[in-house]
Structure formats: C-alpha cells, structure tokens
C-alpha cells in the first residue's frame, strides 16, 4: 500500500556531508559547496543589517568586524550586536572603534577573531607538535569539537598544520602569532 505524495523538492544543508547516510547522498541531484565570505562581502552584509536596524556606525568599524569574523556572516552579525550593546551601555548612538575594542575585550576575541579556546590551542602548540587527543584533553573538550570547530579556522588561516603522523604543529605564521600575542600581554 503506497501513500500518494505530491512532487516536492528536498533541500539539505550540512557542513559535513559524510555524516549523511550513503543512500541519501546518492540521491542528491545537485551538490553545491560554498566558500567563505570575503571581508568586503561581510562588510556589505553588516551594512545591510545596520541600515535595516537604523543604527549608526563609523565605516572603519565594519572593516574591522568583517576581518574578525572568519568569513562567516553569523559571526560578523554577532560581533556587531555586541558592539551595539557596548555603545548602548555608555549611551552612545554611534558604534565606534572603541566600542568594537571593548566588545572584543569582553568576549576575549583577538584582532584575528580567535576566541579563548583558539588562543589557548595555539599556546599549547608553542612547546612543540602534539596529538589531537592530547590537545583535546588539555582544552577539556571532546576531540571532535577540537577537530571540527577549533582547528577548522586555524588550518584555513595557515596558523597550524598536521604532519604525516597526525601531530598538530604551529606553522611559521602561527609561531609569529603566538610570539606577538605574548609580547602584547607583557
């Protein structure tokens, strides 16, 4: 006995297509893989949001928020919202670079958009290459979270690399980042 079902289109969105069952993946007619947004595209997204909400912002702030957002609109919009909260807390009508700086301080976000876990991850690798399970235990996070959430941007940004045996290590760019961060805190 069959059920009559009208024609329909099923849209799937995932960041890990291999978590889907093979029969479902086989039935996909079209697979699209999107790239991360550029800083310029993120600035446009932010400008649209600011216009829709009728907020006032210094133009330079948009560029700095976009740069800290890792190519991801939701991160850019979240940081914009944080800046707006900071501006409102001091009764300012315009979001300025000072508000962005304070929002980043409160959320412990550095100038590249790295949060506390990513910053700690980089400092752990300063001593030398480490296996994923060791990094995860030192961060008190599941290995899957470390590999899929924390490492994703660090690899894309060229701050870390994986060697043939699976050890995580800092790249030259990553070492520069850690040494510069240490100098700024001193």
Task: Identify what each model region corresponds to.
Residues 1-13:
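AAA+/SF3 P-loop NTPase mechanochemical coupling elements
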Residues 6, 19-55, 59-67, 77-78:
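Conserved AAA+ ATPase core "coupling" helix
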Residues 12-15, 36:
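Flexible glycine-/small-residue-rich
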Residues 62-68, 74-89, 120-124, 151-152:
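C-terminal helical "lid" of AAA+/P-loop NTPase domains
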Residues 85-128:
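Conserved alpha/beta core segments of nucleic-acid transaction machinery
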Residues 126-186:
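Terminal-proximal interaction/regulatory segments of ATP-powered molecular machines
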């Amino acid at each position: 006995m069959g059920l009559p079902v009208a024609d329909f289109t099923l849209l799937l969105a995932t960041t890990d297509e291999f978590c889907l069952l093979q029969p479902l993946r086989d039935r996909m007619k079209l697979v699209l893989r999107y790239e991360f947004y550029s800083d310029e595209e993120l600035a446009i997204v932010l400008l649209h949001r600011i216009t829709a909400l009728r907020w006032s912002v210094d133009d330079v702030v948009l560029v700095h928020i976009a740069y800290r957002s890792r190519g991801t609109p939701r991160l850019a919009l979240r940081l914009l919202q944080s800046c707006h909260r900071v501006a409102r807390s001091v009764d300012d009508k315009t979001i300025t670079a000072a508000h962005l700086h304070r929002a980043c301080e409160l959320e412990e976000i550095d100038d590249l958009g790295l949060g506390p876990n990513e910053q700690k991850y980089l400092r752990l690798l300063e001593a030398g290459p480490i296996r994923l399970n060791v990094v995860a235990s030192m961060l008190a996070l599941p290995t899957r979270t470390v590999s899929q959430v924390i490492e994703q941007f660090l690899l894309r940004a060229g701050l870390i690399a994986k060697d043939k045996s699976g050890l995580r290590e800092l790249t030259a760019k990553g070492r520069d980042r850690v040494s510069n961060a240490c100098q700024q805190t001193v």
